[in-house]
Amino acid sequence: MSEWETKIEAIANSTIPVNVTSLSGVPSWMLVLIKRILEKTGKQTLEEVWPNLEVFFHGGVAFTPYREQYKQVIHSPKMHYVETYNASEGYFGTQNDLSDPSMLLMIDYGIFYEFVPLEEVDEENPHAYCLEEVELNKNYAMVISTSCGLWRYMIGDTVKFTSKNPYKFVITGRTKHFINAFGEELIVDNAEKGLAKACAETGAQICEYSAAPVFMDEHAKCRHQWLIESVSYTHLRAHET
C-alpha cells in the first residue's frame, strides 16, 4: 500500500484482535500506529489491547526523544525496549544487555568495518582505522565493505565505542547532522541528551526539533537558534543566565 493513512488503518484493524507480544519498527511511526489503535479501541494503554506485549525492537532514529511518550501509552512493567542498528546496507548491531544502552557490533555478518574520525570526514584523504585500532569514547564515521559488493562505503552514521571486549558502541549521529560553526562540535547525541534533560525538568513531550548556527554580528554573539515542537509541558523553568 502506498497511501500511509490506508496502511495505518489496515495494520490497526488486522492486529487489534491478535495476541501481539512484540513490536518492531521506527519509534516515530510506531507511535502513530499505537495512538491510532488506542483511538479505535477506546483504551488508555497498549497493554489493555495486547496484555502479552513485552518488547519493542526499535531502530532507524534515536529512541531518547520518544521514551517519555512511550511511557504514556505503555505502562506495563514487563515492557522492554531493545535498540537495533540495521539499514539497507546491512545489519550492524543490537542491544544485548537491557541495563546497557550500547549495542553489540555484529562482526560475523560478512562486513569489514573501518572507522574515520569525525573531524576528518570532509578531508580529501581521511585516515581509516581498522576495528582493533579504534579508541573508546571517540566519534567515528563508519565505513563498510560487504560480501554484497559495497566497497569502502560510508553509510553516513557516526558511532562511539564504549567497549572493545566485546566491541560495543552507541550511535551518536550522522556525518552531515552536526554543528561545528564555532568549534563547538554539537552532534545529535549531545543535542538529544540535552533535550531529554530539558523534558525531564519541564514535563515536556517533544515531537520534532531543529537547530542552526547564527553567526556573530555587531548586535549579538555567535549562538545557536533552536526550533522545538512540543506536544505538551507541565511547567517552564524561569530563564537562567
Describe the predicted segments one by one.
Residues 1-237:
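Active-site glycine/GP-rich loop and adjacent strand/helix microenvironment
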